[in-house]
A protein has these predicted regions:
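Domain-level signal for soluble alpha/beta catalytic cores
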Residues: 1-492
């Protein structure tokens, strides 16, 4: 069977359906983790996989949704995290599907700024699970049912830190078209997760196929990555005190065809579905030609948890608010030295209300520990304003700390043609999926002529390319000089 990466762009791949719906038909004791069945009743799990494969599923999703240590600790199973996850992959493979997607669900921890869990705590949870799953060589890791873009992004970064396997990720939207915890829409989710290194993005759970269709259409316009769609079997409702899903297999199949026409290439089903739903998806959509995907608009796209901004490529002028900079601002500098962020928040709200599209964040001042204050400011602002952030520091340690925790795609301000700057900044931009401003300044200072400054930008661009960045990651700042200060070179 061809590598899953080779199949993604050429055909519709059908993903299986709900695991829990099928397992809960058996007499499973209340309060037991379904993952425990991977070792206590493996035949039940394997049989579910086999039924979905017989229905035509190309991809089996492992029974490891609740497989983080934190989730397993709730059942006293934390020390079995490796064994339970590895068993999940083996059982999925035994079921006979062509491809194995190693499933990873939310950790159950709520990350800063919405909760108290730190980035590093959640990162370690995902890295441990991803490492265990990857040891059994599935075709891809599959992060799913994410309601907070910060956790989804953290999961992708953690997975990529321990394996070279492709990482698929789906998020869950509410009826308002936004992720429940972070308020992220489909466009921002696609931009942020693609930048983090996802190989395919999409949505699952939360909604039925009818409600999901317009969100698929929107997401498909925001990325060129393969789109994954796995709706519930209709919108859930309570019936005699029991949650039921009213959708039918034929309805799912009909919408599966529409999902493909909207740009999806991996289609499955979620809560309430059974192998009959998978069979309907196969019947209605498996042989359907993939839609012609439109290229995203040109320019560099950055995103915060709740907003997307395009820079250049014919986009309207972007206004960058630069008041969050302690230079010449005694009140701001004093608050930062004291470890307070009230003035940062105040300036951010003022600039957002005044129409800024992006907010530059600079906390560099004597006596300020940038390595702790910059990430703290980034977290505070990401939960406060919709505008994407521009991270403005010459301290590479502070920059990395801020890039790690920012639940979006930041713009780095900036990298110059100085050797030390390129060596420090460009690997960070690549690792964390950030865009970066290229500054027309090198080890010899600011060139006197416009042509020489453009040459410096080209040099930095070439170095950025060598680090795996593309023109869609790069913004040029050619440092236009006033004729009054540089009369000889202003027009050269």
């Amino acid at each position: 069977m061809p590598d899953i990466g080779l199949r993604l762009g050429g055909e519709v791949l059908v993903i299986d359906g709900a695991m829990g719906t099928m397992l809960q038909r058996h007499d499973i004791p209340a309060g037991q983790s379904l993952m425990q069945l991977n070792v206590t009743a493996p035949e039940l799990v394997e049989e579910v996989h086999r039924l979905y494969a017989l229905a035509g599923a190309d991809c089996a999703t492992t029974n490891s949704f609740g497989g983080s240590r934190h989730k397993l600790d709730a059942y006293g199973l934390g020390e079995q995290v490796v064994d339970l996850n590895r068993a999940a992959v083996r059982l999925a493979r035994a079921g006979g599907a062509a491809h194995i997607l190693a499933d990873m669900g939310p950790t159950g921890l709520v990350m800063e700024p919405l909760g108290t869990a730190t980035f590093d705590e959640v990162f370690e949870q995902f890295a441990e699970q991803a490492s265990a799953l990857a040891a059994e060589q599935p075709d891809a890791l599959f992060i799913e049912t994410m309601t907070d873009i910060a956790e989804a992004r953290c999961a992708v970064l953690a997975a990529r830190s321990v394996t070279d396997l492709p990482v698929f990720v789906t998020v869950t939207f509410g009826l308002n078209g936004r992720m429940d915890l972070s308020g992220t829409g489909p466009e921002a989710a696609a931009v942020i997760l693609e930048a983090a290194g996802a190989a395919a993005v999409g949505m699952n759970c939360g909604l039925g196929p009818e409600q999901m269709l317009p969100l698929v259409e929107r997401m498909a316009l925001a990325t060129t990555l393969p789109i994954i769609v796995q709706p519930n079997a209709g919108m859930p409702r309570l019936q005699d005190g029991v949650t039921v899903f009213p959708g039918t297999a034929d309805e799912m199949g009909t919408y599966a065809a529409r999902f493909v026409d909207a740009g999806a290439s991996l289609v499955g089903s979620c809560c309430g579905s059974t192998p009959s739903f998978t069979g309907a998806i196969v019947d209605f959509a498996k042989t359907r030609p993939l839609a012609e995907r439109r290229e995203p608009e040109p320019g560099v796209v950055v995103a915060g948890p709740r907003g997307v901004v395009r820079v250049g490529g014919g986009a309207p002028l972007v206004r960058v608010g630069e008041r969050i900079n302690p230079t010449g601002k005694k009140r701001l500098a004093e608050s930062l030295r004291a470890g307070r962020l009230d003035v940062v928040r105040e300036y951010a709200i003022e600039q957002a209300d005044a129409g800024a599209d992006l907010l530059d964040v600079n906390v560099g001042a004597a006596g300020v520990d940038q390595q702790s204050v910059l990430p703290a400011a980034v977290l505070a602002l990401s939960g406060l304003v919709d505008q994407p952030l521009v991270l403005d520091t010459t301290d590479p340690v502070a920059l990395e700390a801020a890039l790690r925790v920012y639940p979006g795609r930041a713009l780095i301000n900036s990298v110059s043609g100085e050797s030390a700057s390129m060596e420090a900044v460009l690997p960070l931009a690549r690792r964390y999926g950030a865009a970066v401003v290229l500054l027309a300044l090198d080890d010899d200072g600011i060139p006197a002529t416009a042509g020489a400054r453009v040459d410096v930008v080209r040099k930095v661009r070439d170095e950025a390319w060598s680090h795996g960045l593309t023109d869609r990651d790069l913004v040029a700042d050619t440092l236009v000089l006033a004729a009054a200060t540089q009369a000889d070179g202003a027009g050269a």
